[in-house]
């Protein structure tokens, strides 16, 4: 099972929503790309309404390093380094490294963070960017027909035979069942927020 659908408790009381609606307000999935370059690399996606934060980010979690022979404890196993690209709110990037502290055998987390607005000023909003590109005839930010068809090929089986909608509490990160998707991969990560 690689797909979880959820609906926040209280959604059915929203004006205009059918009393027995099975429309999801949350989804989480684990995807694989079927080629040699990405073989064995999982891609996790989750999105939803009434979550604790409104944030869009891409997080690359690198392979966890093996236990190092010269550490204070033979059982010490550093966590994975991560690169986070925050798209919204306030675009930025963060490199989160595990490094050995000077004159010590202990590891600590080091964050190299950059808020793009601090460096280059506030840019246009994503909608302003898309509208400007559309008016200029720039197709780079828009999906072509082959990408749209491939997306439908991937999601159509989920639409044809969807799993049940699982209720989740407002202000949480979705149904607990979604945690099973990331089991063995370090779990879901909280978003990088300032």
Features from the language model and the residues they span:
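Secretory/organelle targeting and membrane-embedding segments
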Residues: 1-194
């Amino acid at each position: 099972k690689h797909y979880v659908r959820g609906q926040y408790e209280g959604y059915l009381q929203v004006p205009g929503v059918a009393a027995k609606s099975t429309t999801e307000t949350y989804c989480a999935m684990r995807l694989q790309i079927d080629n040699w370059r990405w073989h064995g690399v999982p891609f996790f996606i989750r999105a939803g309404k009434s979550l604790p934060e409104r944030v869009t980010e891409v997080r690359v979690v690198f392979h966890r390093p093996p236990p190092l022979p010269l550490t204070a404890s033979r059982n010490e196993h550093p966590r994975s380094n991560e690169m986070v690209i925050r798209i919204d709110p306030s675009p930025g990037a963060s490199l989160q490294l595990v490094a050995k502290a000077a004159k010590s055998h202990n590891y600590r987390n080091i964050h190299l963070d950059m808020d793009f607005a601090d460096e280059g000023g506030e840019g246009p909003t994503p909608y302003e960017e898309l509208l400007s590109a559309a008016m200029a005839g720039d197709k780079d930010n828009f999906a072509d027909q082959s990408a749209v068809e491939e997306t439908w090929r991937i999601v159509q089986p989920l639409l044809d035979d969807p799993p049940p909608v699982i209720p989740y509490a407002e202000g949480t990160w979705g149904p607990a069942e979604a945690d099973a998707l990331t089991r063995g991969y370090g779990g879901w990560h909280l978003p990088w927020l300032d």
